[in-house]
Amino acid sequence: MNESYPIGRPFGIEVRVHILFLWMAFFLIFVGGNPLGTAAILFTLFGLVLLHELGHSLVARHHGIQVLDIVLWPLGGMARMSEIPESPRVEGQVAIAGPLVNLVLAAASLLLLGLLGGWGEAMGPSVAYILAHILESPTNFLRAFIAMNLMLGVFNLVPAFPMDGGRVLRALLATSMPYVRATRIAAGVGQVLAFGFAAWGLMGGGIFLLIIAISPVLFPLG
């Protein structure tokens, strides 16, 4: 893919990083007031998105689908495959594998946090506070790790096609109706949700909701 560069081949799958991610990382790290904390957040998130995409890729490969590469973008990642799964069951398994990776990591990290005595204030005052203090202690890092995994897992399960949740919805619908009709319904649900998120964001819900609304179009994850 143009403007992306190979950085490794985990499990024999080429991973590429888009130049926009590199520019974004450089800008956020060196322009912000907390370069070490920002770098920790960015590269932890980078690793979690990669694991998310590897979840999709390894399940796809298990079902005989060739994975061409994984490209990491500023707001997500994309596992490029040689074909779309023909079976709704296989498509559902491939789609849900990515979010499940993040949710399992969040659950395991929450257990570890409990062993370290951090359950009493597991999430702290807010996600923003957790991320701002990511390097202050091992428990703070774990809280940030949990928060990022939950955001990735839950965000991707929103049934807004072509995101993972939308693909799972299409796979479920396709078990009882033609594939084309299932796609139209899943896409329609995604458009309604995108409109709702955009309206909420414009009315004061925050920029994050606007990003949710447009990201399935601009930066599809998985």
Residue ranges and their predicted role:
Residues M1-G222:
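Hydrophobic transmembrane alpha-helices and their immediate loop junctions
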